[in-house]
Amino acid sequence: SSDHCGPLQRLKVKQQWAKAYGVGHERVELGIALWKSMFAQDNDARDLFKRVHGEDVHSPAFEAHMARVFNGLDRVISSLTDEPVLNAQLEHLRQQHIKLGITGHMFNLMRTGLAYVLPAQLGRCFDKEAWAACWDEVIYPGIKHD
């Protein structure tokens, strides 16, 4: 593990995620904002989500998809301070993304999207450096496969 995404940064990311992730309807709103931001960066990315009705981010199928993705992200972020659990979560997600053909490009869209929507939820307490470090050094390398 790296100094940049060290124990303090991991704790900050965990706490900030817990606050932003919130409960119920807030999660749906956060999800919609995130995917809108991703599709605004690259409208062709929508095509990857045909199976879950990506053309309508308010559809029940897409809401269920967002909940699954957030669930996975929540498990990864929650285990940032527990290396063996973290590595198992990342490997599980890596395998899933290989099966779905999700590329590094999509992870970059999500990284940029999170950096856009999380400050809207968290205001000044959003720690951009900690999030960037933990995404770039831990989360992304653990999931990417291309």
Swiss-Prot record:
Assigned protein family: Belongs to the globin family.
Keywords associated with the record: Disulfide bond, Heme, Iron, Metal-binding, Oxygen transport, Transport
SS bonds (residue pairs): 5-134
Globin domain sequence ranges: 4-146
Signal peptide span: none
Molecular function terms, GO-annotated: heme binding; iron ion binding; oxygen binding; oxygen carrier activity
Extra remark: Giant hemoglobins of worms are formed of a monomeric subunit and a disulfide-bonded trimer.
Stated name of the protein: Extracellular globin-2A
Keyword Iron annotated: yes
List of residues binding heme b: 97
InterPro entries in the record: Erythrocruorin, Globin, Globin-like_sf, Globin/Proto, Haemoglobin_extracell, Mb-like_M
GO cellular component: extracellular region; hemoglobin complex
